[in-house]
């Protein structure tokens, strides 16, 4: 069993936004089981939002598997202070571990997790393997929802590969930080994969948000996040995210308790 830390409740508005997102996803239809969360660039809040939604589904009695599919640069183990050396997705996809060996129960209600595993130099090739498809088909028989946290899609192809195995996708957009054109690029990639776009979460709405910590950690956004994969894009594009009525979703309040140090 994985013992997770830093999972306490956020502020009231954050919790209500996550409940709204959960309800909207339920309204999308009973056939929706595998849902991916992605973003254009690192640090838009997708990993925290995916975790919060998975936890929220668990709280209402749904059995949920949260899959950390960001094999390049995961944040889950560090953020939730997971101890030991747990197996992960990269080991399963490379044939080192079985599916049973990478699925972990957690100390949270109805929530199991698959962690990313050790860094792999060729994650796109691993994700394209038949083993990933087999895994998704197998866990669909067990869980009510499979929530997949994917890498940001502006720089690498991993997210589009994962999307081809998902029933729906949610794009997380940091308010005021990502251009409309860049979000449309992600949207186009998802459409080409055949994945249904459920909508978007407009994250960190209202107030200013300090980027200096993240620029120091990641370089200038994508440039250092993926090494050679990110240099093509360099610094993230200036501009504002699309209005919420252009890509429907939950507004998550910008508050110190709701901000995520996230990819």
Regions found by a protein language model. Give the residues of each.
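P-loop NTP-binding module
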Residues: 3-263
